Amino acid sequence: MPYVKSNKIKLYYEETGKGYPIIFVHEFGSDLREWEQQVRHFSREYKCITFNARGYPPSEVPEDAKQYGYKHSVDDIANLMKELKINNAHIIGLSMGAYAALLFGLKYKKMAKSLVIAGVGSGAMPQHRKGFFSMANELADEFIKKGSKKVASIISNSGSRIQLKNKDLRGWLEFKKHLEEHSNIGSALTMQQYQALRPSLMDFENEFKRMNIPVLLAVGDEDELCLEINIYLKRHFLKLNE
């Protein structure tokens, strides 16, 4: 299995195709397998790199809470690219991965050719902060007490996932199965140290105003916790090549 090291943590990755590189950064509820259809398509013309975040086997699962958090996730993208000798790439992130990808664009500007930011920003708006943090910590406790298999049933039937079940049952079953296979400890610490502690995207207003990387924001029309912050980002922060 191919691995790279990021601050001493082993990250599993897969590389498919040849051409200009695209780095895919997965969401909390999934792993690199969620990008299968995208890799099948884009690897015809691009080099596609997917990887599992720290805490997601077969990547290393540290038991030290200090080894988790959004700053580590941003640096993990950069360290993966450095290990693979990639100077810059298109970066595509979903949800939690979109948060890391967007902040990667702030910290490592020269390494990002463009950013595709999908479903970013849960809990970013002031009225959502308290409820989001409470939910994140409750889910972390559930992973420890009940395990990934039972929590997968809760998450896969939540409001933001139910349309996948309605429209693509096979895809939904695959999502649920993958989530059941995740590490209890890795998922809990990711939720506690990354999701529950990450700053609001609104805190980066000045940095976003200076961003000159092409950014595509994408959000589902029923992704209620992300709609408002994406509109806010478009109007106030990101120039989006205007």
List each language-model region with its residue ranges.
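Active-site glycine-rich loops that stabilize anionic/oxyanionic intermediates
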Residues: 19, 27-30, 95
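Serine-hydrolase catalytic-loop signature spanning alpha/beta hydrolases and amidase-signature enzymes
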Residues: 27-37, 48
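Active-site loop/oxyanion-hole signature of alpha/beta-hydrolase fold enzymes
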Residues: 39-40, 49-92, 96
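Flexible "cap/lid" loop of the alpha/beta hydrolase fold
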Residues: 106-107, 112-146
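Conserved alpha/beta-hydrolase catalytic His-Asp/Glu region
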Residues: 127-131, 146-207
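Short beta-strand/loop motif that positions the catalytic acidic residue
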Residues: 211, 217-219
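Conserved alpha/beta-hydrolase "acid-adjacent" motif
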Residues: 224-229
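Catalytic histidine neighborhood in serine/cysteine hydrolases
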Residues: 234-242
